[in-house]
């Protein structure tokens, strides 16, 4: 890790370690830069905010939590940072690693235990369970955030997620749209922010690998077979055939002037 003393036997080993640590540092700075740009473009953080990162245990949410912890040390607007997980009750899901990770970076952690899995897959038997699961999961977290006095939740949707959402919107809804960077939910008094909107998935992957962050295996029975996964694979194929398509779609999303998107605040 960066900043640790490492004994080496040869000059070649020393050079290799230096290059590895330099790459690690550059990737960390790149991700932090993209997150900060999004935060400032859409005024996501205000002085005195209490922000919880929604942590699923996956690479994106853990990367965002770690990056937000680093940002918390030097960002000019002071904010309190928390982490929250909704345990929907899938068999085999274990968030012990998430709790330990939060303890290691000194972030208060809250786990909300529910029976959402039973409701979605046994009681409801909906052929499209993802939207119901997401709605119930968010509702459970928002309720707990209100009890804790936390006013914002940060979701780890990255650049690829925004692009895939726009593609799904075209395919399944007949419109061009993506979720907004900032959304205030008056019924629960919580503001949703998405600070990783400019960060490509590959960059997040590299950050997680270099930080040595251990992710939690997703035991959802429909993981990997959803409409979003279909859109992801389709987008990858389109981008291979037409390099640069992802960037052009993201440009269109950011400049789409969607009704519920806030204005960009750039100097």
Describe the residue ranges of each PLM region:
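Intrinsic-disorder-associated, low-complexity terminal segments enriched in Asp/Asn/His/Tyr and depleted
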Residues: 9-12
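ATP-dependent adenylation/nucleotidyltransferase module used to activate substrates
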Residues: 22-166, 172-175, 202-210
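Catalytic subdomain that performs nucleotidyl-dependent activation
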Residues: 160-240
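A short, charged, Gly/Pro-tolerant segment at domain boundaries
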Residues: 244-267
């Amino acid at each position: 890790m960066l900043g640790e003393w490492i004994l080496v036997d040869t000059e070649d080993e020393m050079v290799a370690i230096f290059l590895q640590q330099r790459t690690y540092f550059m990737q960390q700075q790149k991700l932090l830069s993209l997150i900060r740009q999004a935060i400032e473009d859409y005024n996501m953080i205000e002085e005195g905010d209490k922000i919880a990162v929604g942590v699923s245990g996956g690479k994106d949410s853990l990367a965002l939590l770690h990056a937000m912890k680093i940002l918390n040390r030097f960002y000019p607007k002071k904010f309190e940072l928390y982490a929250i997980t909704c345990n929907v009750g899938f068999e085999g899901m274990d968030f012990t690693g998430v709790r330990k990770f939060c303890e290691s970076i000194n972030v208060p952690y809250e786990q909300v235990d529910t029976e959402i899995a039973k409701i979605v897959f046994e009681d409801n038997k909906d052929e499209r369970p993802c939207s119901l699961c997401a709605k119930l999961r968010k509702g459970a977290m928002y309720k707990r955030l209100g009890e804790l006095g936390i006013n914002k939740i940060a979701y780890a949707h990255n650049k690829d997620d925004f692009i895939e959402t726009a593609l799904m919107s075209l395919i399944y809804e007949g419109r061009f749209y993506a979720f907004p960077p900032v959304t205030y939910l008056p019924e629960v008094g919580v503001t949703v922010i998405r600070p990783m909107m400019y960060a490509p998935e590959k960059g997040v992957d590299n950050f997680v690998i270099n930080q040595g962050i251990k992710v939690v295996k997703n035991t959802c029975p429909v993981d990997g077979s959803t409409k979003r996964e279909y859109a992801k694979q389709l987008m990858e194929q389109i981008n291979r055939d037409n390099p640069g398509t992802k960037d052009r779609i993201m440009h269109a999303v950011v400049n789409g002037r969607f009704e519920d998107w806030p204005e960009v605040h750039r100097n």
